Amino acid sequence: GITLIELLVVLTILAFISAIVVVNVLPERDKAAVKKAKIDIGVIESALDQYRLDMMVYPSTGQGLAALSALPADAANADQFRPGGYIRRGAAVDPWGHPYQYRFPGEHGVFDLTSFGADGEPGGEGLNADIVNWVQG
């Protein structure tokens, strides 16, 4: 049979392997979330440009990014709205579950798009840093 010492050795080895996996996988997951947020912002930028081409104006700040998935009630040129919208419903949420922030007209460009990062608060560093559609300097 298996002795208690052999069992403890096996459990120690498994714990050691698990620790190595956790230390190496978790940072990669965080990097992937930041990368996804950057890609999402690019996709939303393209959807906003398509909306403007069809509707002749960007959605207002009040209409927000919801205007990309459902026709706003106060939209002019409603007959020009693309059937099915410009992004799928719920796509305007960052990898941490927070809505992307949209402002038109923007302070840094035609429009501003922002993810407040993992903490969902403006500012921050590292994983909590804002991810934006303009060059920060």
Locate each region found by the language model.
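Phosphate-coordinating loops and pocket residues in cytosolic domains that bind phosphorylated ligands
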Residues: V22, P27, Q63, A70
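Aliphatic-rich helix starts adjacent to a transmembrane/signal segment
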Residues: N24-V43
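N-terminal single-pass transmembrane signal-anchor helix
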Residues: G1-V25
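Short, surface-exposed interaction loops/tails
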Residues: K31-K35, S46-D49, M55, A66, ...
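Non-catalytic regulatory appendages
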Residues: V43-E45, D49-R52, G62, S69-G84
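A residue-level signal for beta-strand positions that form part of recognition/binding surfaces
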Residues: G1, G84, V110
